[in-house]
Amino acid sequence: MSASSRRWVYIDTSAFVKLCWREHESEALRAHLDGRPLISSVVLHVEAVRAALRRSPSDVAIAQQRLRRMSRLDIAGPTISLASAMLPPEVRSLDAIHLAAARLLDVDLDELVTYDDRMRQAAIAQGLTVSSPN
């Protein structure tokens, strides 16, 4: 196993939905993440199930199955504090929580994967390595 495959990949909701349902970038994303450990905050759980419900109630099971394959970070005081104070103020609240969780990881984080332009810019501003395989 290569060094990069042992490093964690933080994924946000825009990436997660591409793992659940076929979208333009789904195949490239799956290949990019193959065998790599995935992690995200508990916010992803809420966002993913809500996205599944918008598609179809039967899609909730697909999202939940994928969520079980990932490590999940709970939101604690330091994450809330960092997210609350995150600059610039235009960073959306849920994005700020994702970014704070990624920054506070005590594991070897390789990258954050997102397909959302605002999230990408905010992550870069936070000093994170960002990718959007396509």
Protein language model regions, located:
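Surface-exposed charge patches
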Residues: Q65, A100, Q121
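His/Asp/Glu-enriched, well-ordered alpha-helical/loop segment
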Residues: A48
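Acidic, PIN/NYN-like endoribonuclease modules and their adjacent C-terminal/linker elements
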Residues: M1-W8, S41, L73, L104-N134
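Short coil/turn segments
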Residues: W21, L44, P88-V91
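Acidic catalytic patch
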Residues: R68-P89, D95-A101
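Short, well-structured N-terminal submotif of metal-dependent ribonuclease cores
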Residues: M1-S40, A52-Q64, L128
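Alpha-helix capping/helix-boundary segments
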Residues: A15-F16, L44, T79, H98, ...
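Acidic active-site catalytic centers that drive phospho-/nucleotidyl reactions
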Residues: D12, D95, D116
